[in-house]
């Protein structure tokens, strides 16, 4: 399997914070992930430190046998802190304190100057830069223009459509009303959304006029919906967290990661 799996360990820390004690330790998850065949560790250092803390970041970077990809907002203090630690990659993401999880891609146009300056800072520190974006062609062009080295395509819309179409979510109090389409319409929307992701991945990695970007994908991916995304040849990496950690409660973290790698191979 050529596509890589980055395991997001945010919710290991979420479980720890539920009791405000010292376990489970996110660092321990790093070594389990390596043994299970993960290719990378991903986590989000949020402004409110709701799960991962600064001390976690430092310990994990210093001790991890796997490459580290840190997600963060355009926050000057966080950027300075991370540049001092020099992880392999930093992925810039949008952030709202009131959100449960990241709700969409970066608004590159409105933050153009800040993103440009931040990417230059990453480059000077030898840190690979990525932008978390919605699968829109204009965002790909802007990412190229800014000098990003990679993009991660936000798969949340696809994931939510799949949940509403093929799970019991639509019959619960968690139903996503904005995705409550009739059966035929929701399947057509899934197909369109997948095509948007595939076309953006192809555009990102093309060599026309300028250097290609590496293309990753993530958000809301689970064991049922990951196969179609993993089959897009231009996507070289998936970053997945919640579904792996949720399954690990029942089967253990190592087995949950192995099962995800197997699901990524299913067409």
From Swiss-Prot:
One of its GO terms (biological process) is pyridoxine biosynthetic process. Pathway: Cofactor biosynthesis; pyridoxine 5'-phosphate biosynthesis; pyridoxine 5'-phosphate from D-erythrose 4-phosphate: step 5/5. The record marks 152 as: Transition state stabilizer. 1-deoxy-D-xylulose 5-phosphate binds at residues 10-11, 46, 51, 101. GO terms for molecular function: pyridoxine 5'-phosphate synthase activity. It is an enzyme of class 2 (transferase). Keywords: Cytoplasm, Pyridoxine biosynthesis, Transferase. One of its GO terms (cellular component) is cytosol. The active site is at 44 (proton acceptor), 71 (proton acceptor), 219 (proton donor). It is found in: Cytoplasm. 3-amino-2-oxopropyl phosphate binds at residues 8, 19, 220, 241-242. It catalyses: 3-amino-2-oxopropyl phosphate + 1-deoxy-D-xylulose 5-phosphate = pyridoxine 5'-phosphate + phosphate + 2 H2O + H(+). It holds the Pfam family PdxJ. The keyword Amino-acid biosynthesis does not apply. Its main location: cytoplasm. Belongs to the PNP synthase family. Catalyzes the complicated ring closure reaction between the two acyclic compounds 1-deoxy-D-xylulose-5-phosphate (DXP) and 3-amino-2-oxopropyl phosphate (1-amino-acetone-3-phosphate or AAP) to form pyridoxine 5'-phosphate (PNP) and inorganic phosphate. PANTHER family: PYRIDOXINE 5'-PHOSPHATE SYNTHASE (PTHR30456:SF0). Homooctamer; tetramer of dimers. NCBIfam families: pdxJ, PRK05265.1-3, PRK05265.1-5. This is Pyridoxine 5'-phosphate synthase. It comes from Helicobacter hepaticus (strain ATCC 51449 / 3B1). The lineage of its organism: Bacteria, Pseudomonadati, Campylobacterota, Epsilonproteobacteria, Campylobacterales.
């Amino acid at each position: 399997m050529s596509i890589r799996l980055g395991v997001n360990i945010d919710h290991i820390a979420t479980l720890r914070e539920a009791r405000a004690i010292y376990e489970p330790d996110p660092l321990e998850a790093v070594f389990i992930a390596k043994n299970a065949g993960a290719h990378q560790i991903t986590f989000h250092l949020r402004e409110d430190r709701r799960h991962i803390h600064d001390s976690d970041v430092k310990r994990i970077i210093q001790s991890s046998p796997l490459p580290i990809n840190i997600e963060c907002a355009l926050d000057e203090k966080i950027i300075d802190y991370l540049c001092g630690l020099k992880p392999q990659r930093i992925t810039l993401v949008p952030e709202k304190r009131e959100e449960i999880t990241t709700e969409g891609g970066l608004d590159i146009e409105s933050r153009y100057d800040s993103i440009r300056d931040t990417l230059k800072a990453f480059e000077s520190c030898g840190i690979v830069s990525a932008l978390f974006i919605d699968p829109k062609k204009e965002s790909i062009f802007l990412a190229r223009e800014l000098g990003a080295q990679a993009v991660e395509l936000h798969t949340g819309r696809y994931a939510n459509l799949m949940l509403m179409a093929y799970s019991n979510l639509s019959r619960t109090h968690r139903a996503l009303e904005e995705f409550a389409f009739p059966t035929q319409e929701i399947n057509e929307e899934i197909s369109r959304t997948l095509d948007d992701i595939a076309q953006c991945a192809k555009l990102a990695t093309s060599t026309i006029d300028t250097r290609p970007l590496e293309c990753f994908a993530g958000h809301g991916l689970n064991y049922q919906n990951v196969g179609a995304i993993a089959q897009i040849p231009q996507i070289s990496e998936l970053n997945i967290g919640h579904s792996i950690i949720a399954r690990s409660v029942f089967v253990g973290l190592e087995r949950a990661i192995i099962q995800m790698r197997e699901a990524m191979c299913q067409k």
